[in-house]
Amino acid sequence: MREEAATTLGKVGHADAGAALVEALGDDYWQVRLRATRSLGRLRYAPALDALIETLGHRISTLRKEAALALGELNERGAIAPLLAAQDDGDPEVRKAVRIALSQLQ
């Protein structure tokens, strides 16, 4: 249920949605964090920059991949250095997402 809420918040685009989604990045369930990460990227919620950078280092590769894609959508220059550092990720899907994100930031 919280997964769907995170997805819906990303579609609504209400001003308070971004803050709620950043809070959802700390949820106990990784699926909720995944949906929140996607939604933050969709909203281009710049205040989520630091939280998404932190998610870029998560142990679950799917979250790292989505964080990279969301960082690309934010279009914030502060994401470049962490994305460059993530180019060596052990997961090829994460590396692909990092390349996509970096191309969006150029």
Residue ranges and their predicted role:
Residues M1-R2, Q31-R33, T62-R64, P92-R95:
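Positions within the helices of HEAT/ARM-like alpha-solenoid repeats
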Residues E3-T7, K11, Y29-V32:
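Acidic (E/D-rich), amphipathic helical modules within compact regulatory domains
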Residues N75-Q106:
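Leucine-rich solenoid repeat scaffolds
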Residues T8, S39-R42, A70-E73, R77, ...:
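Core register positions within helices of long alpha-helical scaffolds
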Residues A46, H58-K65, L69:
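Strongly charged, low-complexity linkers/loops
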Residues H14-G26, Y45-G57, E76-D88:
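Amphipathic alpha-helical scaffolding segments comprising HEAT/armadillo-like alpha-solenoid repeats
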